[in-house]
Amino acid sequence: MKIFHNTHHAQHAGRQEMFRGRMVDCHEVPDRLRYVLEELQRRPVGPLLTPDAALDVDAAMARVHAPDYLAFLASAWHDWVAMDPANAERDALPSVWPLAAKHGFRTDAPPLNFAARLGQYAFDSGTPLMAGSWAAARQGAACALAAAQAALAGERFALALTRLNLKPSRGRARRSALWFRLHRAAPARSWPVRSLQS
């Protein structure tokens, strides 16, 4: 088995999230993947690999996510800190959710205000965005692509180990998702993967 490990996953390590009306420690933490890695190292089932840097992960993500959403994620941390340098010490959590399509607002251009953009692309206030969220999500997508390529090349078993959730925000996958749930599997699933039963 080839196991493609997201070496950047720990860069997405939120401090707090909103849960049932109060701020709590984040539920989705790097330790979740660390436990799996420790077990895989205890009973080796295959090499831990990193994706080839030459993979065109940006093109693959663009096949399943809207360009404005990807552009937002790529610049979100910079924009958050530009609002207030003190934000560098805080995770970004949305506080408003402009429901543009529901209320007939324009959807062809993102809002100029960062807080509105954050809310437009966020699913909830339970998933903070931090300095390393984009790098972690992008590397997770690369892991999914590498595993798909390995399967297409004949590898019987390939795993993308990346704190992955296969379901992006319901019905809004192209333009919003929980940051750690950037739909990493979708680029791989958009490929014509043959059956691996043989």
Language-model features: where?
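HDAC/HDAC-like amidohydrolase catalytic core signature
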Residues: M1-Q197
